[in-house]
Amino acid sequence: MAKPSNLVIVESPSKAKTIGKYLGPDYTVKASMGHLRDLPKSTMGVDLEHGFTPKYLPVSGKEDLIKELKTAAAQADTVYLATDPDREGEAISWHLKELLALPDDKARRVTFNEITQRVVTESIRNPRDIDYCLVDAQQARRILDRIVGYQLSPLLWKKIRRGLSAGRVQSVATRLVVDRENEIRAFVPKEYWSLDVKLDRIGKPGSFVAHYYGEDKKRELENEEQTDAVIRDITGREFTVTNVKKAEKKRSAAPPFTTSTLQQEASRKLNMTPKRTMAIAQQLYEGVDVAGEGTLGLITYMRTDSLRLSDEAMAAAADFIKSRYGSSNYYGKFHVFKTKSGAQDAHEAIRPTHVELDPERIQSSLTKEQYKLYKLIWSRFLASQMANAVYDTVSIDTECAGHVFRSSHQSMKFPGFIAVYEEGRDEEDEAVGSPLPDLQAGDRASIADIKKEQHFTQPPARYTEATLVKAMEEKGVGRPSTYASIVSTIQDREYVVKTDKRLAPTPLGEVVNGLMMEHFVDIIDVEFTANMENRLDDVEAGKRNWKDVLADFYQGFHQEMLDAEAALEGTRLKVPEEETDEICEVCGRKMVVKTGRFGKFLACPGWPECKNTKPIVERMPGRCPNCGSGLLKRKSKRGYAFYACEKGAECGFMSWDVPTELDCPVCGHTMFKKSGRGRQKAFCINEKCANFLPEDKRGYYKKKTDAGEPGEKAEQSEKKGTKKPADRKTAAKKTAKKTEAAK
């Protein structure tokens, strides 16, 4: 009797490789490369008049893959749908089942919170049916966003500027940034003063600094007059120690990472964007080739809001801590953290799958970014099961003429978890103070020096990407799977710009936000959006019907659309010109950003008297494969985009291919993708790499060029093999051969 044939379908080749190693020859593992069905790109694809029925179509460009999967599925006895363990993954599995026409008894759903041999084999032994509540929750979110995007975007085109688009959750995120900017503008600084005295002990050696605290209770010195009055009272008088308080302070470790806290900490400590953090985490989850171990999934699933850890993971951490750091550094029992109310808790917190694989042990198998992020996750998890840090604290009050001054100091007694990991901070901690002499109540001191200083209260800081993610989580806007894309999207749409690592609204963002605030109060309302997330959670839990959620939303939204179109009839909103710090070398004015046929450029506001213009240099992600420098986006004479090293002719690298944020998992070089709309697959251009994709396999759409392009690099591009079209009527897209370093 022939052995049963088993097909396993996952999203990515790397995940397929890792799982295939665990399952063996009786299982064929293939990758769907993400979604194979989706709503159409050219139309809304949702029947608003008949129950919000979606019209799904096969994704363009994946016809051969669909055919391949259909053939493999037809030959298999069982098809295991092993996409990611969340709403999106469940929806992909459902689309696969429908697209491949799989009967219920043949399509089995399996999920892996971590891609390890134990979990993979256990999941295959215990498959389940597709969870249609999860699918419905994903469909509801997808259709909500499609309705808002397809109906609201045309209004923005007509009333503000062509090419604009609107999103449901992104609009709220933009509002948070605009609201913070308005708080900063409206902020009125308040004066206050600090007063420090350096005191010498009387009759004993030693000195210390004391800070003004108040009188009977704490009091702020509001101006210089109040400060000088205190100075007059204490000048020439002795201070007496009135209270000495010594204590032991314990500090417990932070919990293991959730999606939100991982993005925040990676932003603070590694300077990674949320989007980049999730891309690297996905690589670590799906599997990395580790020397001597083969392909291993190194972390648990990275989209989670749970703080839960399995008993097995905590036991493994306990053994590791005791063996490496000693029993005194172990917490003493499983350190269980309480997950916040409202969290879905479907998955564990983010942790390493093999705690014994410490970062240094596998560093040579990881890219720099993989190593840094893995070390962050590994250290945070291990620290969460370690003993508290212990500090000795002392607080001393001294009194003079009815005024109380306070000195404090904190010193570490036992580092505990801090030996492994310390959480980053968005704001600076209070100073721990200088060491203090051994003072007793009744000790006397005299003034050696007085220092007064004026201060002003500061406005709230602009959001960083980390603090915006934190604010979204606290307000219930978005979910772990959407934080990174939201923060990225509002920047891509140029509603928000990052300046000195902080987010500020652009003039365009403020105009769009103003329109939304006036005419779409529900869409832009934080509480309304948070409640919608709760309704989607209810759909996932089987407590609500997804079409009822859509109907309730659309009734109000449709009326807002009608009202807005009527109110804005004949109105065109003007976006203020965006002034830059670039000075026009012709007339000295500050140049402004303009939008032309081929995109944005800098122009002198003195037109028509001054007609000076300049290109805007746009930095791209990734590194030059030739010299490791930054990459810039430039425009050819015909307006086509190409990408070049920031060192220009000194390096000579240029390409029509678009650099991405991804590093090749094999060689670590920046990966590129072909230009064009939609999700393009990234590829490696390093010819020495096993992952290299030849140019003829990249699927170029050729576009005609003329001699001398791109830009000033024409001569170099021809020398490197750039081909010009044989016929002017034949569209040809030049692709420069890579530099010697990339070969």
Model-predicted regions and their roles:
Residues 141-151, 169, 199-201, 249-261, ...:
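Core structural elements
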Residues 17-40, 171-220, 384-434, 590:
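Structured, non-catalytic alpha/beta "coupling" segments that mediate domain-domain communication
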Residues 18-22, 68, 91-99, 119-123, ...:
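Alpha-helical scaffold elements adjacent to nucleotide-binding pockets in ATP/GTP-utilizing enzyme cores
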Residues 2-7, 18, 153, 186, ...:
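Basic, low-complexity terminal or inter-domain segments flanking catalytic cores
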Residues 261-274, 469-479:
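Short helix-coil junctions and helix-kink-helix linkers
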Residues 115-197, 247:
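C-terminal or mid-to-C-terminal helical accessory/interaction module adjacent to the motor/catalytic core
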